[in-house]
Amino acid sequence: MLVTHGYTSGPSMLVPGHHVAESSWAPLLGPGRPLDTDRFFIVCSNMLGSSFGTTGPNTTNPATGRPWGPGFPAITLEDIVAVQHRLLQQLGVRHLRAVVGPSYGGWQALQWALSFPDMVDAVGSLVSGLTHPKGLSAESTRQRFADHPAWNGGWHYGDARMTDILTELRRQTLRSYGLETLFEARMPDPA
């Protein structure tokens, strides 16, 4: 089985005690659980372009000694899945019982069904969707970054001023999941 992660987490989503945006999947992993380690070989690799370890815009370009920054090649969903496929080939995995993932990991699972339908028996796309939530498309997000005074044409590394837009983008994303309503119901205003 392949477990795919979202933008704001990594393979640590399967590690007990790790707190990630999509919530820990550690309770789902182990003998007799949905991700049954007695029945399946479970792989959860880091996503291409992720800030949690694989190559991305903040990776050092060996030709310049600086981060790739805006010169980093564009990555598509198909690219991410192709890299996962290549990893599985190197591990000797020829068939997957399932590909499952939350959030953007769910999009990856769906892409697996499109790119390698004969290799995958089932997909699980959880807390995901077929389209971006309204106002959170890749282009609108890129434009919000480009309009920020600290953007500097994409050369913003080490500039703490980008934190405010990243924080607001995360809040907006969580609101689109309905978490604001959930929190209001669980933690009513004491006033």
Positions of the model-derived regions?
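Short, flexible loop/turn elements at secondary-structure junctions
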Residues: 6-8, 46-49, 103, 127-130, ...
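Conserved hydrolase catalytic core segment
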Residues: 94-137
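Catalytic micro-motifs at enzyme active sites that drive phosphoryl/nucleotidyl and oxygen chemistry
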Residues: 29-33, 87, 109-111
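N-terminal cap/lid subdomain of alpha/beta-hydrolase-fold enzymes
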Residues: 1-61
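Short, amphipathic alpha-helical segments
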Residues: 74-82, 102-106, 110, 114, ...
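Alpha/beta-hydrolase-fold enzymes
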Residues: 120, 125-191
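A general structural signal for short secondary-structure junctions and capping/turn motifs
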Residues: 32-35, 115, 162-166
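Conserved acidic catalytic loop of the alpha/beta-hydrolase fold
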Residues: 63-74, 78-98
